[in-house]
Regions:
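Active-site neighborhoods of metal-dependent hydrolases
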Residues: 1-8, 13-249
Length: 249
């Protein structure tokens, strides 16, 4: 509250809050009080979380009510799901914890791809896939969650159907999903990627995103193209907003 009051004394600026709102009533009340005491608008990041798939609606509705009371609150919402990118050019891939992969991970991409195409390297990696549950790397525990992993494609498909997940393809074809991932990531000379939608994809589609964008308390935002660029790159959210929502979907 003290920080908010100082911003109010300055007479300009926006209070930006990022919170999971685990204790919704208490945390939202604090955010609202910051806006009320400062007289400044409040912006909060809002998205559909898998564990609480309807809370985004409650949050935006509460913001609308606060604004009607004279406390301006807006929810920043994304233009699509926030997703992890896996590939040989990024931080994550399904084989990153394998000793055989670690042995070649330092190589330039072209040399690494050449090594990955050797039968002995392929066998050494695919026979020893592990997940390091102690790894501090964001997203590293998801590298073999085949049911939520999709070929990103070119052009990218940011609303993939469940039938196109690596797990679903493996079930239909009788293939090993790890083998599918291995071959996929070698496409386009090792630049192909796997997409793992997390936030805003609890229903397996982007219907909730559409509702968020149309809500009177929402403003489009949340494009992350810097701090996590090796894992998450959502800098194209504005393009998605204009091209995909405005024209294609």
């Amino acid at each position: 509250i003290g920080i908010a009051e100082a911003l109010g004394a300055a007479g300009k600026g926006v209070i930006q809050i990022i919170s999971d709102l685990v204790d919704f009533d208490q945390e939202f009340a604090l955010a609202k009080a910051m806006g009320e005491r400062s007289g400044r608008p409040v912006s909060m990041s809002v998205a559909q979380a898998k564990g609480r798939p309807e809370q985004w609606r409650r949050t935006l509705d509460a913001m609308s009510q606060a604004t009607a009371e004279g406390i301006v609150m807006r929810g920043q919402v994304g233009a699509r799901a926030v997703g992890l990118l896996m590939g040989h050019q990024g931080t994550l891939n399904p084989f990153m914890h394998c000793e055989a992969y670690k042995a070649i991970a330092h190589l330039p991409l072209a040399e690494r791809v050449e090594a990955l195409r050797r039968d002995e390297v392929r066998a050494a990696i695919l026979d020893n896939i592990i997940v390091d549950k102690e790894s501090p790397i964001i997203g590293s525990r998801l590298v073999t969650k085949w049911h939520i992993m999709y070929p990103l494609g070119d052009p990218p498909d940011y609303e993939p159907d469940a039938s196109t997940s690596l797990a679903a393809i493996a079930e239909r074809t009788g293939a090993d999903p790890a083998v599918l991932a291995y071959d996929l990531l070698l496409e386009r000379n090792g630049t192909a990627m796997i997409y793992v939608p997390t936030v805003n994809f609890a229903d397996g589609n982007l219907d909730s995103v559409r509702e968020q964008l149309l809500h009177d308390a929402a403003v489009p935002g949340l494009s992350d193209g810097g701090a996590h660029v090796g894992t998450i790159c959502d800098v194209s959210f504005p393009t998605t907003l204009m091209q995909w929502w405005g024209r294609d979907r």
